[in-house]
Amino acid sequence: MKKYFSLLIMLAVTIGQAEKLSYNATEGTLISVDVSPDGKQIAFDLLGHIYTMSINGGKATAITKGTSWNMFPRYSPDGKKIMFTSDRSGSDDLWVYDFYNAEFTNVTKMKLPVHQGTWSTDGRHVFGTALNMKVRHPVYMFNMYGDKQEIIPVG
């Protein structure tokens, strides 16, 4: 009887109807926030996704979707892109979302997880840290197209 009941539950779960879940969040914890260079928008992470909204409040627009975990949004100096940490490639990398063409680009493409991204003042490079046992607290510099990386000596 126990096996039969378990089989019924598995069958119900397998062929059950999918339901769309939605929620309204009015507060959160451990949220990373960045203000756009023009001071009109904010970007923030909540429950593993990146959102933007007016600095005056209102409805947030999701930049990321799906099952990946996304965090630490940072506007580019010109405000046309947002960099963030995401595991969408299987490991934490720095990704950039371009508002103009709505495309995502993996900037780091490393075997090591990369975190704590920040932009160069001209927006042509991003910097991030990675846990590399060969180098103490390495800071990596990446150009925006991911074809060059170098370790920046720290302290």
Features from the language model and the residues they span:
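Beta-strand-rich domains and repeat architectures in extracellular enzymes and scaffolds
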Residues: 22-53
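A flexible loop/linker signature enriched in serine peptidases of the S9 family
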Residues: 27, 45-51, 59, 65-71, ...
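Sec-dependent signal peptide recognition
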Residues: 2-8
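Short coil/turn segments that connect the beta-strands within blades of beta-propeller domains
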Residues: 38-40, 78-80, 122-124
